[in-house]
């Protein structure tokens, strides 16, 4: 009986049990860091795809706005020709026959004036990322087994911290790009409306001259 009691309290058995628990916890923690790394890598890939799509959308908006600007330029020339033709036909003596001066309006100056593309996003203050913080504190994990598994855990968490920092910068880039594109869309809408009104006015003026 005494021997069984002594065996049940054998320090070596307790140490082995503690080591077994430590190994189990380390294995579970290692697997968790692997899953974390996989998830942030998937998020990074999704962020890259989103930035690519935003870039392509931005190029399309640029082409659309360039088209609006070309129409505006063409209408300036058309209005000049109509005015010159009106002078030859003697139509300019009556104020009602004069073309409307669209360029004098505030809406025109807002989208075709100086700094029309000037959407300046505020620059956020620099924030220390997780990698820098961990480098200063000495690492991500508290070592227990101090073996290759904990080395991999540290490497995984270091990569996770790096990717999270990249995701943070991606999010800021997306926010700035979306804000810029929204402002550009607003300009395109105004330019489209003004071009339409300008074309309608020129058509009316040309009809009166016929």
Swiss-Prot record:
Q: Which GO terms describe its molecular function?
A: SNAP receptor activity; syntaxin-1 binding; voltage-gated potassium channel activity
Any one annotated GO CC term: membrane
* Coiled coil feature spans: none
Q: Which SUPFAM superfamilies match?
A: SNARE fusion complex
Gene3D superfamilies (UniProt xref): 1.20.5.110
Q: Which UniProt keywords apply?
A: Cell membrane, Coiled coil, Membrane, Repeat, Synapse, Synaptosome
Which Pfam families would you find in this protein's record? SNAP-25
> Mind telling me which InterPro entries this protein's record contains?
SNAP-25_dom, SNAP-25_N_SNARE_chord, T_SNARE_dom
Residue ranges of the region described as Disordered? 1-23
**Source superkingdom:** Eukaryota
Location(s) in or outside the cell: Synapse, Synaptosome; Cell membrane
Q: Which family does it belong to?
A: Belongs to the SNAP-25 family.
Q: What does this protein do?
A: May play an important role in the synaptic function of specific neuronal systems. Associates with proteins involved in vesicle docking and membrane fusion.
Q: Report the protein name in the record.
A: Synaptosomal-associated protein 25
Q: Which organism is it from?
A: Torpedo marmorata
Give the gene symbol: snap25
């Amino acid at each position: 009986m005494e021997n069984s009691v002594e065996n049940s309290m054998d320090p070596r058995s307790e140490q082995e049990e503690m080591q077994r628990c430590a190994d189990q916890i380390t294995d579970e923690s290692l697997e968790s860091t692997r899953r974390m790394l996989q998830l942030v890598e998937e998020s990074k890939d999704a962020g890259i795809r989103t930035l690519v799509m935003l870039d392509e959308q931005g190029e399309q908006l640029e082409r659309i706005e360039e088209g609006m600007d070309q129409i505006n330029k063409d209408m300036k020339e058309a209005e000049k020709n109509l005015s010159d033709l009106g002078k030859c036909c003697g139509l300019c003596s009556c104020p009602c026959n004069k073309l409307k001066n669209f360029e004098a309006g505030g809406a025109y100056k807002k989208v075709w004036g100086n700094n029309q593309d000037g959407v300046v996003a505020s620059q956020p203050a620099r924030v220390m990322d997780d990698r820098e913080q961990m480098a200063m504190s000495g690492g991500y994990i508290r070592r227990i087994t101090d073996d290759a598994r904990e080395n991999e855990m540290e490497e995984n968490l270091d990569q996770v911290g790096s990717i999270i920092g990249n995701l943070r910068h991606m999010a800021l880039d997306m926010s700035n790009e979306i804000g810029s594109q929204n402002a550009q869309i607003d300009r395109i809408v105004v330019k489209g409306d003004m071009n339409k009104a300008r074309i309608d006015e020129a058509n009316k003026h040309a009809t009166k001259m016929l």
